Amino acid sequence: VKPLYSGRLDWVASLKDRPCPLNLNPVTANLDTSSLPAAVLWDMDGTLVDTEPYWMRAEHELVESFGGVWTHDDAMLLVGSGLLGSAAILQNRGVDLAADAIVDRLTTRVQEQLASAGIPWRPGALELLRELHAARVPMALVTMSEQRMAQQISGIVGFDAFSTIVSGDMVQQSKPHPESYLTAADVLGVDASQCVAIEDSLPGVAAAVASGAVVLAVPHMVPLEPSEHYVRLDTLAGVNLTTLTELYASRRRSSPSLTTTQTAKDATPA
């Protein structure tokens, strides 16, 4: 009886003289993988997804329910801030609830909007996320939102993008303190200085810079001035694995002293 595999022996033998590619991943086949960042750390609200309008609506409804007034300028003050700090501001505007209750109400309302209106992805974010995942670059979601909301958004991505999620209810210090970014890098088993962090707000950028990461700042609701401390991009649209790797390598060459030894004081925005 002729073995089923006998017809393949000549084909197998023909491979012995062919060079064997070390990189079997088609996404990174033409890329110097030694120049890839150790991980990419994503902010969520305003960077990955355009949820800031949902938060603003939730804040407005909550303040008005207690007879107060909440303006657009008021809402802009909270962009990128931790939820407990935001709750204190809402209390000062007349919301007669404990801080934890305010956070719970806001998060629930935003999640309701996500469920009814869908996930508004920021331009280019999902495409870059998908390409990084295909290239097997470790990724973390680093957000000041609660874990339940981060899990909701992560679950809708459509693939297992994030190795870990560090949320605001997991850390002691909110952005602009670097704790969340340092925690994410630690969980991934990498040094923050070998990571790329993608952010959109001043507190978030300050936190990422203070962690020692190479920072891509993509402003959304609040403008960010050019700075030697980060790479500013108008949008993630058109940014791919090659672009990100080149930006990372260029930044590492121009700032070889990037380190995770910066202090929390350095993270505080001017």
PLM features: residue spans?
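Asp-based, Mg2+/Mn2+-dependent phosphohydrolase catalytic module
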Residues: 1-38, 130-131, 137, 146-270
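Structural motif
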Residues: 78, 142-144, 198
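Conserved G/P- and acidic residue-centered "switch" motifs that form tight phosphate/ATP-binding loops
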Residues: 43, 47, 143, 200
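N-terminal helical cap/lid subdomain that shapes the substrate entry/recognition surface
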Residues: 33-135, 148-151, 159
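A generic alpha-helix signature
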Residues: 53-54, 101, 143, 175, ...
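Residue-level marker of regulatory loop/turn positions in helix-turn-helix DNA-binding domains and
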Residues: 121, 142, 173
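Hydrophobic residues in well-ordered beta-strands that form the structural core
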Residues: 50, 141-143, 217
